Amino acid sequence: VCSSDLDPGIEFGKLIGQDLEIFRRLDELHTLGFPILLAASRKTLVGNVLGGLPSSERLEGTAAVNTFAIARGARIIRVHDVRAMARVARMTEALIGMSVDGTPLERCRADGTIVDESELLPSGE
């Protein structure tokens, strides 16, 4: 079962600049000792930074946010596009040498159970 986490609350009562500052300082939050949960998938922040894109066109922005967050210590990422973002996470892990602290990312369901990597792959991969 996944442990307790720290969610910085992207877009909850903050301005865009404040949310961007949270992203830039995720590595500091990581030092508190809790897995960081990030939920920025398709957020308005992503759409606004990319020129007002609708949520259906925010995949690339979400991928960039998640890559940056993983590199800065986020360990739990809530997403809409699970397979695409699992691939982004896997590639990011490879680029940064698995993970910042040597542990694999936790991929959790809403009920707290950990998702098996094989569940994220299409049949035959």
Regions found by a protein language model. Give the residues of each.
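Active-site-adjacent loop and "lid" segments of alpha/beta metabolic enzymes
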Residues: 12-125
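Conserved phosphate/ATP/ADP-binding segment of small-molecule kinases
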Residues: 9
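Short, small-residue-biased leader/transition segments that mark boundaries at the very start
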Residues: 1-3
